[in-house]
Amino acid sequence: MWLEKIDIQHFRNYSEASVSFSPHLNIFLGRNAQGKTNILEAIYFLALTRSHRTHLDKELIQFQQNSLKLNGIVHRHSGNLPLEINLSNKGRVTKVNYLKQAKLSDYIGHMTVVLFAPEDLQLVKGSPSLRRKFIDIDLGQIKPVYLSDLSNYNHVLKQRNAYLKSTDKVDINFLSVLDEQLADFGARVIKHRLEFIKQLEEEADGHHSILSNQIERLKISYESNIPIQNSKDIREAFLTILNQNHKRDIFKKNTGVGPHRDDLKFYINDMNASFGSQGQQRSLILSLKMAEIALIKKVTEEFPILLLDDVMSELDNHRQLKLLESIDEEVQTFMTTTSLDHLSNLPPNLKTFLVKNGTIYEKQVD
């Protein structure tokens, strides 16, 4: 798939912009704080209805404006597909082929994206919430039912926590009813995640082996606070530990176990990657991104759109070369950079844009 064009209204520092893209490589050039990253963020937001930089929607709407609007035309094997998203203080309105979508899971997946940004380098050593977000975004794009199960789980979790906070005299029978619902959706969420991690590990290990000249093997472990013997027993194991934690949850007034507290661990040659060198960690992240592309292609039979936000400056020449070599010519790629000097072997069928003060100019590469 590829994004033919995007129309932007009141997004970040853009009042209005309309840009047509190459189906291959698109490079946004400009000094810092001109709006290069905002373009990639707009594409990401059009695909996923969320930002990778902030969880506050109001930060996305241009200063002194009340709403933003993004329109795009995506080319897929099945034909051209118009996408639209409107954001205001009343919430989001999403449309596919001009038809309003009732649920988030109905919208996400029509345009798949893989983002590689400098903050991704924190995936290994950062907080567990970053790794859960990584799973949710990738898995949600290839398996819409996961988003539905996750949404239902979070809804029941919110109910359970609100009830625990609302009273000092907890009705154990009512709490047990919530436990049953939480275990139903939580078990589904964990099963989806386990299947995804297994597939991701297979793809990422192969890429990491190539990057390390066949020296290193990559493993990914899903770390749950629920003892998982096999996928059939997850619900019962979750229910058991919820029951065992009743006293703790009543005292703390929150839910201490469940997939909302799970984590990922990465291992390089059986060593926790958080103790690895910076070079090893960068190779690991690069391997994950390559694996994301391959996995989305395998499941959806179409390549995702690749967003590279100023990551070339974070990679040495060897990793830059491996990244560029790994990008299939069918993958539409968007890249931001302050200079083309450090980039070599660029394809002839690219488009280059100069970004200055929230305005985008198409330019010719010398």
From Swiss-Prot:
Major localization listed first in the record, in broad terms: cytoplasm
MF (Gene Ontology): ATP binding; single-stranded DNA binding
Gene3D superfamilies the record matches: P-loop containing nucleotide triphosphate hydrolases (3.40.50.300), RecF/RecN/SMC, N-terminal domain (1.20.1050.90)
Signal peptide: none
Positions of ATP binding: G30, R31, N32, A33, Q34, G35, K36, T37
One Pfam family cited in the UniProt record for this chain: SMC_N
Family: Belongs to the RecF family.
Cited function: The RecF protein is involved in DNA metabolism; it is required for DNA replication and normal SOS inducibility. RecF binds preferentially to single-stranded, linear DNA. It also seems to bind ATP.
Protein name per Swiss-Prot or TrEMBL: DNA replication and repair protein RecF
Source organism phylogeny: Bacteria, Bacillati, Bacillota, Bacilli, Lactobacillales
Gene: recF
